[in-house]
């Protein structure tokens, strides 16, 4: 897959009910005749140089989307690995700074590329937090995606709280939790943490009305999932 083979889809993030649109999440997808999917194997096969070049392309494509859709608000996933790159941070500031009020950067919980010593891992975490602080001071909105999984453990999330405005939890991780009661306690713990820090808490992966109503009873306001809208090929003004 080269850069001509992938496209952006978008999925709504809503507040309280399906009618209140907060923003759309941009999703990188590879299209085939029958479906569109995230190209995981291709992503994992990239060299460091290819990885960086692909992110340059993503940054420029997102800028084009923002310029063509002047009133829409979006979010885009960027991995921790991309945000430790000083060159990519410079490109983000150059291309996205003027759109920062309409764009949320969702930081995914992707593990570091390659094997790292404890000291190297500490240096990576420090560089990541420094770059997050830099973007935060410039007025960018940062969100932590898939909290409670992978490298987005409670300890790591706590270390990044000063620089983020949102926490996102996915119900797709429910199979890792034993019972519905455990899940409720888990969600409410994250929700309490977000509220105590003045952060937005979003639950994604919602597929049914029952799930929507259950989360509403728990006091969870911001939601995302197939129930509110399946990812759709992004249509830009002027297309």
Please place each PLM-identified region on the residue numbering.
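A general structural detector for well-ordered alpha-helical segments in enzyme core domains, enriched
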Residues: 61, 88-95, 124-132, 153-160, ...
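Active-site glycine- and acidic-residue-rich loops that bind
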Residues: 80-87, 140-141, 145-151
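Bacterial c-di-GMP phosphodiesterase EAL domain
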Residues: 1-98
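Helix C-cap/helix->beta junction micro-motif
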Residues: 70, 99, 138, 163, ...
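EAL-family c-di-GMP phosphodiesterase catalytic domain
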Residues: 1-34, 108-115, 147-154, 158-239
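EAL-type cyclic di-GMP phosphodiesterase domain
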Residues: 32-56, 81-86, 99-137, 171-192, ...
């Amino acid at each position: 897959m080269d850069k001509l083979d992938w496209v952006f889809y978008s999925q709504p993030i809503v507040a309280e009910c399906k009618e209140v649109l907060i923003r759309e999440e941009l999703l990188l997808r590879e299209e085939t005749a029958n479906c569109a999917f995230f190209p995981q194997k291709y992503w994992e096969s990239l060299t460091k140089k290819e990885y960086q070049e692909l992110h340059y392309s993503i940054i420029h494509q997102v800028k084009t989307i923002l310029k063509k859709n002047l009133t829409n608000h979006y979010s885009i996933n960027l991995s921790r690995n991309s945000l430790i790159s000083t060159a990519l941070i410079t490109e983000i500031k150059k291309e996205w700074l003027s759109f920062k009020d309409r764009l949320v950067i969702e930081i995914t919980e992707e593990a570091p590329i390659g094997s790292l010593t404890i000291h190297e891992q500490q240096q990576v975490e420090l560089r990541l937090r420094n770059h997050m602080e830099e973007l935060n001071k410039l007025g960018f909105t940062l969100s932590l995606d898939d909290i409670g999984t992978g490298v987005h453990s409670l300890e790591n999330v706590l270390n990044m709280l000063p620089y983020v405005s949102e926490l996102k939890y996915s119900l797709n991780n429910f199979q890792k939790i034993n019972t519905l009661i455990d899940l409720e306690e888990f969600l409410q713990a994250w929700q309490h943490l977000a509220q105590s820090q003045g952060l937005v808490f979003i639950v994604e992966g919602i597929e049914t009305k029952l799930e929507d109503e259950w989360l509403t009873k728990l006091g969870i306001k911001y939601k995302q999932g197939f129930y509110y809208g399946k990812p759709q090929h992004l249509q830009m003004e002027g297309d």
